[in-house]
Amino acid sequence: LAANKKVAFMAKQELFTDKNGLLRFLVKNLGAFAVNREKPEIATFKTVLELLKTDWSLGIFPEGKTSQSHILENVQKGFTLIAKKAKADVVPIGIKGFDGYAGKSLFKKHITITIGKPISYELPPEEILKQWAEQICEYTGYENRIGQEQEVSQ
């Protein structure tokens, strides 16, 4: 795993106008770009594919939010399709201790970040999702409620 690559993060567009000044500052200054989750645009996917052709990596938060319930469900599965189209392996990253940050100082919290094992983009999308969810739940302690019945369209 090459750690010397720059990372651009896909972030929901609401974060760029968030009332939390620290969060807004971080999103704008740590290489994030806005994504409309309700109406994803083709230009977004073109940007992602161009980005991955360079020396950048892409950070995606498929959950779309922090979870107060510690349950992994309703995951945006498009990351599996992006991985396949870009021929880029998926590296799960679990963040534990970040939930409940709103209105509180992050400097008083213990946050653990675990970098997982790469998942081959050559696997079927459903298998990429399954392996990603298993690793994320292992690293975060979340309960996996992503069912086998969930389909990933190709």
Where are these regions (language model features)?
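Catalytic core of membrane glycerolipid acyltransferases/transacylases, capturing the structured
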Residues: 1-39
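Non-catalytic C-terminal accessory region of glycerolipid acyltransferases
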Residues: 43-154
